A protein has these predicted regions:
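Conserved acetyl-CoA binding element of GNAT-fold acetyltransferases
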Residues: 35-44
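Catalytic nucleophile loop
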Residues: 71-76
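Conserved acyl-CoA
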Residues: 55-70
Length: 89
């Protein structure tokens, strides 16, 4: 099944879904100017090692970019991902 990354603004998180199962999330906060601060990434232990954290980060960054929303990173996992996978713009 194809993973889906969706924003849940009420919960302030991006969610990674595999079918009906929530497999991971990136928690965030919002600055007054609308900038998103990516705070923490978590993947369900039953899916560790499957590369879903990377899928979640890239899906989150793609969505933010498509919507024209700036972001800052404090999550170490996202920071490591960005060091290995530079983003456009």
């Amino acid at each position: 099944m194809e993973p889906r990354v969706v924003d849940d603004p009420e919960e302030l998180r991006y969610e990674l879904w595999l079918g009906a199962d929530l497999a991971g999330e990136i928690r965030y906060t919002r600055e007054k100017d609308g900038t998103v601060v990516l705070v923490h990434t978590d993947v369900d232990p039953s899916h560790k090692g499957e590369g879903l954290g990377n899928v979640l980060v890239q899906g989150t960054l793609d969505d933010l970019r498509q919507r024209g929303i700036g972001y800052h990173v404090v999550c170490p996992f996202v920071a490591r991902y960005l060091a290995r996978h530079p983003q456009p713009g």
